[in-house]
């Protein structure tokens, strides 16, 4: 829980980390259906020891909609050998275009 200096606005922040070159994070199925206007994810991409991490600040609703849509698309796309994908609780969030990179302004604090 974070608030502005005057304590007139409070938000919740969930932090998820990964390590590697892909800005991709694993979430659970329950993140699809949880909406709150004052909840944000900060996805952290840890790089090599010599590099600073990247921070992606994303509103909860954006994450929920993205993982719901991308999972549905994955289920409807045949696998490498043409087989159907089996549903599972794993969801992935990606920011391919980097539109949420360092978007601390979205927090509105």
Language-model region placement:
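Mixed-charge (Asp/Glu-Lys/Arg
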Residues: 2-109
């Amino acid at each position: 829980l974070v608030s502005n200096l005057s304590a007139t606005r409070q938000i919740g922040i969930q932090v998820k980390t990964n390590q590697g070159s892909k800005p991709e994070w694993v979430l659970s199925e329950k993140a699809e259906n949880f909406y709150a206007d004052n909840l944000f994810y900060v996805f952290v991409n840890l790089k090599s020891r010599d590099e600073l991490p990247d921070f992606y600040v994303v509103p909860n609703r954006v994450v929920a909609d993205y993982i719901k849509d991308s999972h549905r698309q994955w289920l409807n796309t045949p696998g490498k050998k043409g087989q159907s994908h089996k549903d599972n609780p794993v969801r992935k969030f990606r920011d391919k275009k980097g539109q949420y990179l360092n978007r601390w302004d979205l927090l509105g604090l």
